[in-house]
UniProtKB/Swiss-Prot annotation:
Record protein name field: Small ribosomal subunit protein bS18
A Pfam family it matches: Ribosomal_S18
Organism: Nitratidesulfovibrio vulgaris (strain DSM 19637 / Miyazaki F) (Desulfovibrio vulgaris)
GO biological process: translation
Entry keyword annotation includes Magnesium: no
GO cellular component: cytosolic small ribosomal subunit
Family: Belongs to the bacterial ribosomal protein bS18 family.
Function per UniProt: Binds as a heterodimer with protein bS6 to the central domain of the 16S rRNA, where it helps stabilize the platform of the 30S subunit.
Annotated NCBIfam families: S18
Keyword Ribosomal protein among UniProt keywords: yes
Assembly and oligomerization: Part of the 30S ribosomal subunit. Forms a tight heterodimer with protein bS6.
């Protein structure tokens, strides 16, 4: 007895191919945070829907932003920053 799928997943699309004006730059940490988990890992392209070309660029820019201290390497740092600012 075969099981039928209850739903059909919607087709994923690359945000950067759809919107040519959306910059993919290490200085735009707000955009890059959408492609990182709360633990600091880069999300795979099969989940985000980005094309292979833009996933390579995205990975490079995330790594640059980490080196420039615009993004954190691991989780837990944002709470540390809040504690230091409260002192």
């Amino acid at each position: 007895m075969a099981f039928k799928k209850k739903f059909t997943p919607r087709r994923k699309f690359c945000r950067f191919c759809a919107d040519k004006d959306l910059p993919l730059d290490y200085k735009r940490a707000d955009i890059l945070r959408d492609f990182i988990t709360e633990r600091g890992k880069i999300i795979a392209r099969r989940i985000t829907g980005t094309c292979a070309h833009h996933q390579r660029l995205l990975t490079r820019e995330i790594k640059r932003a980490r080196q420039m201290a615009l993004l954190f390497y691991t989780a837990g740092h944002s709470s540390d920053v809040k504690k230091k600012s409260q002192i």
